[in-house]
Amino acid sequence: SREGMEISRKTSPIYQNWLDINLEHINEAAESIKEKDMGKLGKVTEENCKFMHEVMETSIPSIVYMTGITNSCLDIVKDLKARGHELFYTIDAGPQVKIICNSNSSQIIKDEILSKTKIKEIIHTKVGGPPSLINEN
């Protein structure tokens, strides 16, 4: 992914636009966390994720991480949002979708993805505790 981002930095015509908007996205995300506004956090997270993938796709050579299954997962997220579930996604340099949701939606998300895609396993995690120092070196 470092190599891919270096290719994007050098060749994508929209790389600088993505950098320019990143500080705005970071500030919006920080504000939404302070406000405990999951919808607002989801909107900016998804927007930044999509922009990053557009940067990679417009690189030479084009870098495409998303697969058909990735897109199927995004369709499921959209459908669940339309049905009133509070969730959003992000995807880093790879095809794996990370879905952030309230705990009351996690099982239906898992059920929908497993029944509608070829995904065999979902890793379910929870928010950890506060930051702590584990090694001073």
Each language-model region and where it sits:
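C-terminal nucleotide
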Residues: 1-137
